[in-house]
Regions:
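Domain-level signal for soluble alpha/beta catalytic cores
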Residues: 1-261
């Protein structure tokens, strides 16, 4: 990662607006995606941003759902215990009227044209977890490399703690074994990004954001213990990768609602 004593280097955390983004089904999607990546790279450089990415356009503009299909051994389920944990938090209880109104109005999560984002899939792991995203990742890296090279360029991935809320375990003998299996799968993606010459950004929004969902009820000490196990899993996934190749942003939750807890 480049450092400077002459200027404050600038960057951002990944997601940039693609106002006329197609949904992926159009016949001209691939050339439009390539052109959009090229344009957003040029915009960042013309703006003076030093460390850039592809705006997460190759990921559909979403920091997490791009992982769908990259984790083997799991199947989609419509109703899981984890789904309840993610969407039922203290703020939803205290501000119940607001969340009811916002959910009906579609203002919590929306796209540039006002459409609500597609709900995330929820998965149940029924066999050994593996990484199956090699082709999708290779395509992302090729588009980014073609548009910008690899110097001062980052690509994003997801931390084990932030993938876990959307996955439920029906295979591993313990929570720890399940979590470290996720970490092993993600390790393959992390290493591929760095080996290709990019900086790796590991997004971990849910590590702190679950405080409102489950942490308050379990208490601070128990939540800290829970979080530490997930930090250890992330460190396991990152083992062997130089620290100066890694970016690690946390998030308090980016939905358009009250944030008081």
């Amino acid at each position: 990662m480049r450092r400077s004593t002459d200027k404050i280097l600038t960057t951002h955390t990944g997601n940039l607006p693609w106002v006329d983004a197609p949904d992926g089904s159009e016949a001209d999607f691939e050339p439009r995606l390539k052109a959009a990546v090229s344009d957003i790279v040029k915009w960042q450089r013309d703006t003076g941003i030093d460390i850039i990415n592809e705006g997460e356009f190759t990921k559909g503009g979403d920091w997490l759902s791009f992982m769908d299909g990259r984790i083997g051994g799991c199947e989609v389920r419509t109703d899981t215990d984890n789904r309840a944990a993610v969407f039922k938090g203290r703020e939803q209880q205290v501000f119940a009227d607001f969340y009811k109104y916002a959910a009906e109005a579609g203002t919590l999560f929306y796209l540039a044209d006002g459409q609500i984002k597609v709900q995330r899939n929820y998965w149940v792991c029924t066999s050994a977890i593996s990484y199956t995203g090699q082709d999708a990742l290779a395509k992302e890296m090729a588009l980014m490399k073609d548009a910008a090279g690899t110097d001062d360029v980052f690509l994003t991935s997801t931390a084990p703690a932030s993938l876990e809320p959307y996955y439920e375990n029906e295979f591993y003998e313990s929570e720890e074994a399940f979590l470290f299996a996720i970490a092993d799968a993600l390790k393959a993606e992390y290493e591929a990004i760095v080996e290709a010459g990019f900086l790796l950004q590991v997004d971990d929004a849910w590590l702190p954001a679950l405080w409102d969902r489950i942490g308050i009820d379990m208490g601070l000490e128990a939540f800290q213990k829970r979080s530490m196990l997930r930090v250890e899993a992330l460190n396991h996934a990152l083992s062997g990768i130089r620290q100066d190749k890694i970016r690690y942003p946390l998030c308090w939750g980016s939905w358009h609602g009250p944030h008081v807890f």
